[in-house]
C-alpha cells in the first residue's frame, strides 16, 4: 500500500505556469514599444507646438511694426515713448515689441535696405539730386572765378618795364594834339637797350646814361647840404649874448 501510494506521487510532475510577459509573441512586443515611443513623441512635441503658436503675432500688428521700421530704417531703435505708442496701436506688450524689433533688425532690416538700393525709381531720384547738387556747386564757383578784379588781383599781374617818361613822372603828351612831336619822335633813331636775363628778385640793371639827367639835381643837393653845415657852424661860433 505504501508503495502504491508512493508511485502516483512520483509520476505526477508539477505544472509550471508561465508569466504573461513570457507568453506574449514578439509581434506584440514590437507594437507595444512603438506605441510607447509614439506617446513619448507626442508629449515632447506638445510644448514646441504650443510655443510656435505663442510666438506668432497678429498680422495687423506685424504690419504696423513693419511700417514703423521702414520709416525709421536708418535708425530702427524705438524709444520708450514710441514703444508705448506702438503697444497701444498693436495691442501687444512692451516685451513683445522689444523682442520683435531685436529679431527684425537681424532678419527684416537688411532686406529693406537692400530693396531700397535696388529700386530703380529711388536710384533715379538719388541720381537727380546728386546732379542738381553738382550744378549748384558749379554755379556757385563760377562767379568766384569770374568776379571783378580787386587789389590783390592787380598786384598779382606781371610788372613790365615802363617807358622812361612814365618812370620819372612826366606827363605824356597827347599824340593828336602834338603831331609835330610825333613826327620828331619817329625821326629820332631808336636807342639800343641792353637786356640782361636775371632772377625776378634782383633789380634790373640801369645804364649809366640814365643817371646823366640827374647830375644837376645831385649838385644842388650837395650844395644845399654844404650850406646847411656852414650855417650850423656859424651859429656855434657866435658868442652867446
UniProtKB/Swiss-Prot annotation:
DNA-binding annotation, residue ranges on this chain: 48-111
Compartment annotation: Nucleus
Region named Disordered: 1-58, 126-209
Annotated protein name in UniProt: Homeobox protein TGIF2LX
GO molecular function term, any single one: DNA binding
Major place of residence: nucleus
Family from the record: Belongs to the TALE/TGIF homeobox family.
Domain of life per record: Eukaryota
GO annotation, biological process: negative regulation of transcription by RNA polymerase II
PROSITE patterns xref list: HOMEOBOX_2
CDD domains: homeodomain
Function field: May have a transcription role in testis.
InterPro entries: HD, Homeodomain-like_sf, KN_HD, TALE_homeobox
Amino acid at each position: 500500500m505504501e508503495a502504491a501510494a508512493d508511485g502516483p506521487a512520483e509520476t505526477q510532475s508539477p505544472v509550471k505556469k508561465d508569466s504573461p510577459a513570457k507568453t506574449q509573441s514578439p509581434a506584440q512586443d514590437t507594437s507595444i514599444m512603438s506605441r510607447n515611443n509614439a506617446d513619448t513623441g507626442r508629449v515632447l512635441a506638445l510644448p514646441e507646438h504650443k510655443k510656435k503658436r505663442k510666438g506668432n503675432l497678429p498680422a495687423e500688428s506685424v504690419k504696423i511694426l513693419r511700417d514703423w521700421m521702414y520709416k525709421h530704417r536708418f535708425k530702427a531703435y524705438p524709444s520708450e515713448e514710441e514703444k508705448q505708442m506702438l503697444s497701444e496701436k498693436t495691442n501687444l506688450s512692451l516685451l513683445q515689441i522689444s523682442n520683435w524689433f531685436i529679431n527684425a533688425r537681424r532678419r527684416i532690416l537688411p532686406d529693406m535696405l537692400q530693396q531700397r538700393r535696388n529700386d530703380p525709381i529711388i536710384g533715379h531720384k538719388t541720381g537727380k539730386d546728386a546732379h542738381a547738387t553738382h550744378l549748384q556747386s558749379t554755379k556757385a564757383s563760377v562767379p568766384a572765378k569770374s568776379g571783378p578784379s580787386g587789389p590783390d588781383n592787380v598786384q598779382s599781374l606781371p610788372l613790365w618795364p615802363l617807358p622812361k617818361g612814365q618812370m620819372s613822372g612826366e606827363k605824356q603828351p597827347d599824340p593828336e594834339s602834338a603831331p609835330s612831336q610825333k613826327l620828331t619822335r619817329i625821326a629820332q633813331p631808336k636807342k639800343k637797350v641792353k637786356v640782361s636775363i636775371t632772377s625776378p628778385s634782383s633789380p634790373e640793371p640801369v645804364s649809366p646814361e640814365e643817371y646823366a639827367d640827374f647830375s644837376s639835381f645831385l649838385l644842388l643837393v650837395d650844395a644845399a647840404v654844404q650850406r646847411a653845415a656852414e650855417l650850423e657852424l656859424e651859429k656855434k661860433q657866435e658868442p652867446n649874448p
